[in-house]
Amino acid sequence: MATVMELKATARPKSGKGAARAERRAGRVPGVIYGDNQPPLPISVEDKELRLRILAGRFLTTVFDVVLDGKKHRVIPRDYHLDPVKDFPIHVDFLRLGAGATIRVSVPLHLKGLESAPGVKRGGTFNIVTHTVDLEAPAESIPQFIEADVSTLDIGVSLHLSDIALPNGVKSVSREDVTLVTIVPPSGFNEEQKAAAAGAAAPAAAAAPAAKAGAAKAPAAAAKAPAAPAAKKK
């Protein structure tokens, strides 16, 4: 069950740029609640509280009860906009969640076993292809993150989304099997591998002519050998 946070809000009686600027001057961030086949609901939330929620992380995967005039609206943030200069929130959108709602979310990817992977011990380096995973999940059980065990990966081996067991009711929305992480070989690794392969092949290559020479000498020796005397008749 996902943890539900509470966020207080007030209704916005007016809309438009002028009304939004007035809300910001009053220390509030304009926003809207939409979805679930209901009309949009213009709201505003306290600037300081919204900043703290965003800075806490996982804002876009956290379910909230927005309290408005004593009534709770179950929502999830879908987007927020920051001032391009001052970097503070200037607008926030919430998606209303109906009973049994299923939504698409982008969930952080956590890796474990980084230091114990054989590829790392051999000098390889992890290349994290994606830091998030796009999933479809029930609103009441959105995973806070997806954990992937990379402790068995060797150089040149990749971990894909299909290699991970997702929680019950959660599925990937990607069309392809997403590559999550690979182990990149160290500098000069390919040359070392080629040299090792060449070194292993050298004794076999040297033994081949000797074997051929031995095979050629055997018939010649047999030809030079004197013929056995014929058996005498009694």
Curated annotation (Swiss-Prot):
GO terms for biological process: translation. It comes from the Bacteria. Residues 1-24 are annotated as: Disordered. Keywords: Ribonucleoprotein, Ribosomal protein, RNA-binding, rRNA-binding. One of its GO terms (cellular component) is cytosolic large ribosomal subunit. CDD domains: Ribosomal_L25_TL5_CTC (cd00495). One of its GO terms (molecular function) is 5S rRNA binding. InterPro entries: Rbsml_bL25/Gln-tRNA_synth_N, Ribosomal_bL25/Gln-tRNA_synth, Ribosomal_bL25_b-dom, Ribosomal_bL25_C, Ribosomal_bL25_long, Ribosomal_L25_dom, Ribosomal_uL5_bac-type. Belongs to the bacterial ribosomal protein bL25 family. CTC subfamily. This is one of the proteins that binds to the 5S RNA in the ribosome where it forms part of the central protuberance. Part of the 50S ribosomal subunit; part of the 5S rRNA/L5/L18/L25 subcomplex. Contacts the 5S rRNA. Binds to the 5S rRNA independently of L5 and L18. This is Large ribosomal subunit protein bL25. It comes from Rhodopseudomonas palustris (strain BisB5).
